[in-house]
Amino acid sequence: MTIQQYIDNLNRLYQTGNAREHSYRGDLQTLLSTLLPDILVTNEPARIECGAPDYALTKGKHNIPVGYIEAKDIGVKLDSKILKEQFDRYRLGLSNLIITDYLTFEFYRDGEKVKSITIGSITGSQIISNPEQFSEFESLIRNFVQTISQTIKNPQRLAEMLAGKARLMAV
């Protein structure tokens, strides 16, 4: 599946007026599986310590996690205060994370946003692609799954990581 086909599929569903967050999941899974043939993209993976992100991306015969994706419905503001608690939990607990509304993708590494890219936008009652962003999106996605968790090299970094985990346990 190309990115344009992905946007076209989202648009078809969006225009029905009755599609919701879960309606688009199969299309994102197919797109990611096409762009990342060596990665297993699991929709609705088993719950983990910090919650239940919508997708887990794993690789190798031992299915080693390389990243997670949390998706919200198209048009949902990703900076919404209503979502803050959940997103904070994921940012603290997951070293490699994407938060998306299926059109905008926010890339987080070790809790910090490193990049945001929009491959489509709502115009009137339809979704219009932003093809000038497709190449960069592909590059960002491929780099996302190449990330290897950092080795702890100093006590301050260890303390920061443990503090984040402790906050998760206190919730």
Please name every model-derived segment:
Residues 25, 31, 41, 53, ...:
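Generic hydrophobic/packing signal
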Residues 1-11, 60-65, 72-88, 92-96, ...:
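Short, basic/polar, glycine-containing "phosphate-handling" surface segments that engage DNA
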Residues 38-63:
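Active-site metal-binding core of divalent-cation-utilizing nuclease and nuclease-like domains
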Residues 28, 55-57, 67-73:
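Conserved catalytic cores of phosphodiester-cleaving nucleases, focusing on short active-site segments
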Residues 19, 23, 27, 50-52, ...:
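Generic alpha-helix structural propensity
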Residues 1-47, 165:
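Charged, often low-complexity linker/regulatory segments
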Residues 29-37, 51, 55, 92, ...:
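Short amphipathic alpha-helical patches
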